[in-house]
Amino acid sequence: KKICIVSGDPNSINSEIIFKSWNKLNKKTKNKIILIGNYELLKKQRKKINIPINLNKIDKIERIKTHDNSLKIIDYPLKFNDCFKVKKTQAAKYVLGSLNLAHQLCIKNEIKGFINCPIEKNLIKKKGIYGVTEFLGKKNPSNKFSEVMLLHNKKLSVVPLTTHIKIKDISKYIKKNLIIKKINTLNIFYKRLFKKEPRIVVLGLNPHNCELEKNSEEVKIIIPAIKELKKKYNIVGPMVADNFFKDSYKNFDVVVGMYHDQVLIPFKNFFKFDAINITLGLNYLRISPDHGTAKDIIGKNKANPKSLLKCIKFFDNFK
């Protein structure tokens, strides 16, 4: 079983966390890894950050030789002058193209899924697409499932109902059918991945759940959705969000919030690099490190590879 890693944003710490992770892996795991990226770019970045690693360019997965100690790279084209300052137009083509290639390899069943390293959202942002989760959701259309962003640590997982949208627009997106479809997807895929029925809690949207006023989103949308979902799943809510993450979260496996920062701020504060991002609802497994491109430390050899290593371990154990 191959572990495919997509190198992601060229203007980032990605090559550094890939190289550092590689040097911490055992030979058996190394033999499973293929990287989609630009060979020349990675060579130049390796030289700049001065991390010893052997790189080997390949053109097809089946031609991988497993007996050597080199990182196998499926070379994807990229035009650049400075290896850490690639122009935005070229970086966008590279990121979209390499994600598309990984998707096609999954569709052809050459790989079971992939890990993508961090990507600046502006490189793939267009109408209706705000991040990799939505990008892959559009490529995996389903009437039954919806793409779901699950941030996972062994102690807790969180799901934002809405992902990379502006705060002022959140209430427009919150619909009963969306809540039901997302939580259906969450429950089914969580059981597949973790072999257990999740204990799910849903947070309200408004401060103090707007004291459950009759025109609030809680009363009109969230409570009716939860009432319907309770017939099938272990789910409660809506809970008031402001003090929920003090202790109450410990009674649940998954916390579903109404928007991105409602659940990601406390989650990242708890677990920092000790977490991964999983997209549920796809025809294959897609995971990524739970952090961004860290442009402030590019090329400084200060990046922490822990989250990528967790991704590799999770993927390697996936059956």
What label would you give each PLM region?
Residues 1-319:
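Anion-binding alpha/beta catalytic cores of soluble intermediary-metabolism enzymes, centered on
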